[in-house]
Amino acid sequence: MGRKRKPLPFIENVTIEAVAAEGKCITRVDDQVIFVPFCVPGDVVDLQVVKKKHKYCEAKVVRFIKKSDVRQEPMCEHFGICGGCKWQNLPYEEQIKAKQKQVEYQLTRIGKIELPEFRPIMGSVKTQEYRNKIEFGCSNKRWFTAEELAQLPQKEDDTVSSLKERHAQNAIGFHITGAFDKIYPIKKCWLMDDLCNEIRNFVFEYADSHDYTFYDLREQHGLLRDMMIRNSNTGEWMLVFQFHYDEEGDEQRAQELMQQVADRFPQITSLMYVNNQKGNDTFNDLELSLFKGNDHIFELMEDLKFKVGPKSFYQTNTEQAYHLYCVAREFANLTGNELVYDLYTGTGTIANFVAHKAKKVIGIEYVPEAIEDAKVNSQVNQIENTLFYAGDMKDILTNDFIRQHGRPDVIITDPPRAGMHPDVINVILNAAPGRIVYVSCNPATQARDLQLMDDYYKVAAVQPVDMFPHTPHVENVVLLEKRCETEIKQKLKERKEREKAAAEAKAAKEAEKLALQAAQAEDLTAEELAAKK
C-alpha cells in the first residue's frame, strides 16, 4: 500500500500583503510565503493550500472575509477564466506602482549592482483596446465553468464518456491553462478595438450554424483551426485563417467562409489563409495564400511607415511602443556621427526609428522574414544608412564581424525574454561602445545581464514602461555608460578578491568534508577529531 498523503492545510483569516510575480498576490503565514491568484492587497480571506513546496505554497481563495478597499470590479465578464488580464481587479494606478516595484526589486535583488534613482514608470496611454493583434483558437471542445456545467442537462450515468459529450460544443476564444485541448468562448474582449469582437463572433456564428467542423487538437482533424486579427493606426485590418483540410470540399468551404467575412467586413484590407497540417498552430514556416487585398498593413510612427505582414513581429501596443522607442532614442543620445548596432532588431523598427540621427545603423535578427521586412521598411522610408543581417545573434555578432563593419559607438539591444547569450555579452564588452541601451521585456534576465557587464559599464538611467495594462508584464529600458579605466581596474580587482574568497571558502568546506569522512572511517569521536586537528 502506498503512503497516505498528508492533507494540505486550510488557513483562516489571512490578510493579503502585496502583489507578486505572474499576477498573483503574496502573503506570509508562520514565515511561509504563500502565492494566491485573483486577490488584491488588503483582502482578508480563507485559503486552501493546493501546492506545497519547500520554500513556498500556492493557495486558492475559499472565502472572502473582507474585500480590500483597493479592489475594483473587473470590467470583463470573462475575468478569472480566460487566463489574460489578471490585474483587472486592481486599479490602474496600483498596477503601475506594482510594476515599478517589480523592476526595482529584480534589478536590485538579482542584479546586485549600483543603481541610480529610477524614473517613474511610464503608464500606458490606453488601458483598454490597446492591442493591435490577438490570436483566437477554434475547437470542438468548449470549456465550461463549474456554473455552466451545472446548468447543462444531467445524464444518469455521469461517466467519462458522457462528460466528454457535454464538452463537445464548438468554440472560438482562448486556450485554458491546464486544459490545452479546450477553448473558452469569448463574447467580448476589451484588449482590442470592438471590430475584433464583431469579426470573431460573426465567424463563429456563421461556421457553427453552417455545420463547419472545428478543430480537435487531440485527434487533429476539423476544418476551422485558428484565426489571427491585426489592426493598425492607419485604420487597416488583417485577418489570417488557419484551416485544416481533412476531406474533399474543405477548401471550397473555407473559400465560402472567407467570402462571407469579406462581404460583411469591408474594413478588412488583408485577408489571408493557410492549410496547416502540422501538430502546432505556428505558421511562420508555412506559405500563406492571399484571399483579398494586400499581404500586409502599415503602421505609422512619426513620419515613418512600417510594413507589417502576418509573420512580422511588431510591438502589440502601437501607441505605447512609440513612447518606448522615444526613450531608447533619448538614451542613445545620437548626434549624427555614430555607428549604431541594433541587436534583435526584429522588423527594424528601432533601427529605422533612430537612423536619421545616426551615421549608420546595423541591425541583426534571427528571423530571415523579419530582416526582409526591415529592409523593405528602410526602402519605404527612403532610409539609406541601414544594413541588416539575419542569423543567430551569437553566430553573427562576433569579433570578426565588428572588425569588418566597425566598432559601434552605441549598441541598442532588445533581446527576447531569455535575455542575451553570454557569448553575445562578451563580444559587446570587447566592442566597448560608449553607451548601451538595453530594452527588456523581462527585467529578471535584464538584471542578470547587467550584472555580467557591471565591471565595464555602470547603469546611468532606468525607465520602466507599461506596455500591457491589466497584466503583470512590464518593459524596462536601461542606459549603460562605459566606466573610466580607473573604475574598471577597481571593479576587476574587487571581482578577483570576491572570486578568491569564494574559492578559499569552497576549499575550506571541502577540506572539512574530507576530514569528517576520514574521521568516520577511523571511527573517531568529534572530541578526538578536534584534538587531532
Model regions and ranges:
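Hydrophobic beta-strand signal
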Residues: 46-48, 135, 341
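Short, acidic/hydrophobic/Gly-rich beta-strand patch recurrent on exposed beta strands
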Residues: 25-30, 173-176, 240-242, 374
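Short, solvent-exposed loop/turn elements at beta->coil junctions and helix N-caps
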Residues: 119-126, 217, 224-226, 463-467
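Rossmann-like S-adenosyl-L-methionine
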Residues: 2-13, 18-23, 248-533
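Short, aliphatic-rich beta-strand segments
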Residues: 229, 235-244, 305-309
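Terminal RNA-binding accessory module
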Residues: 1-78, 387-388, 395
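Extended interfacial segments that mediate partner engagement and assembly in macromolecular machines
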Residues: 62-74, 80-213, 247
